[in-house]
């Protein structure tokens, strides 16, 4: 299984990149996590609809056909760490590749969210995009650790 995080926005602060890289390197070879950052569409005189459509095209261009798409969305289904571990295990058992998509500052195109296989919410809080990358990779690592009974996660 290949797990890809697709994030709109290419530049994150050094602290966020360092934290992301630290968690990403902890995954085993059979569950490598890849980050694909796509360019944010400039706002200059574009309607929100056109801006989101342009970002959608970029997102879709880096997702391989047949990949299970999970959109992060503030109105998505809330998920606990244990529930995320169950999802991760199911994804691994299915053998499907999975792409988890983080939208840009204006979110994700509504049609893209509708076409996603799942929509998940990480938090009820509004989080900066750099923080979402770190939070997501940490929670994926924690979920993986639960699936193998690794002591990283404690209840």
Swiss-Prot record:
Function: Specifically methylates the pseudouridine at position 1915 (m3Psi1915) in 23S rRNA.
A UniProt-annotated Pfam family: SPOUT_MTase
Catalytic activity: pseudouridine(1915) in 23S rRNA + S-adenosyl-L-methionine = N(3)-methylpseudouridine(1915) in 23S rRNA + S-adenosyl-L-homocysteine + H(+)
Gene Ontology CC, one term: cytoplasm
PANTHER family in the record: METHYLTRANSFERASE, RIBOSOMAL RNA LARGE SUBUNIT METHYLTRANSFERASE H
GO molecular function: rRNA (pseudouridine-N3-)-methyltransferase activity
Keyword line: Cytoplasm, Methyltransferase, rRNA processing, S-adenosyl-L-methionine, Transferase
UniProt-listed InterPro entries: Alpha/beta_knot_MTases (IPR029028), RlmH-like (IPR003742), tRNA_m1G_MTases_N (IPR029026)
Principal subcellular localization: cytoplasm
Name of the top EC class for this enzyme: transferase
UniProt-annotated location(s): Cytoplasm
Oligomer and partners: Homodimer.
Organism annotation: Polaromonas sp. (strain JS666 / ATCC BAA-500)
Binding-site list for S-adenosyl-L-methionine: 72, 103, 122-127
Ranges in coiled-coil conformation: none
EC number(s) reported in the record: 2.1.1.177
Family: Belongs to the RNA methyltransferase RlmH family.
Protein name listed in UniProt: Ribosomal RNA large subunit methyltransferase H
